Amino acid sequence: SRNVGPNIDSWSEFQPLGVVAGITPFNFPVMVPMWMFPLAIVCGNTFILKPSERDPSSTLYIAQLLKEAGLPDGVMNVVNGDKEAVDVLLSDERIKAVSFVGSTPIAEYIYATANANGKRCQALGGAKNHAIVMPDADIDNAVNQLLGAAFGSSGERCMALSVAVTVGDETADALVSKMSNVM
């Protein structure tokens, strides 16, 4: 900004951190990395992606597509492995920041270990969603949607529904009655 005051200009400069890493879960092997590496790379960083050892293939395919699209070598990197690979990412002084999505106990471990090693850390664990059922809701449809949201993919989603809030006693009674017939 220019002229924010008499003879005063103001501006902000943002500097890349350097090498940053993302540790991703098995249940969203493409979506969660897509939250991480594009922003890191656009901000001028290089990125190390450590996918779940259960399903690394899609991550390798993403890296291949980025290379084919012209991303320079070394900008997007994939490291496979288990906890040992994670611990290297958390302790290597060249890595300045770590992002994680997964279970709460692992998020706590990653957050504590990354911070103990002086890294910036974003550790998202155990996220669940809530649903609100309004008095004018179609109860049959609400039951179907709630069951799908809670138990779809066997509940192995961080967005799985864990709480349904009903507005009004009549709504709650109707929902419980319909649910008890379904289950």
Regions found by a protein language model. Give the residues of each.
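N-terminal Rossmann NAD(P)-binding subdomain characteristic of aldehyde/semialdehyde dehydrogenases
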Residues: 1-37, 71
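Beta-loop-alpha module in the N-terminal Rossmann-like domain of NAD(P)-dependent dehydrogenases
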Residues: 20, 27, 80-88, 102-109
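General beta-strand structural signal in soluble alpha/beta enzymes
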Residues: 49, 78, 100-102, 121-125
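Short gly/ser/thr-rich secondary-structure transition/capping motifs
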Residues: 1-7, 79-81, 145-146
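A structured beta-alpha segment of the ubiquitous adenosine-cofactor-binding alpha/beta core
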Residues: 9-10, 77-96
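Periplasmic-binding protein-like
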Residues: 38, 97-101
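ALDH superfamily catalytic-core signature
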Residues: 105-183
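PLP-dependent aminotransferase-like
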Residues: 22, 33-86
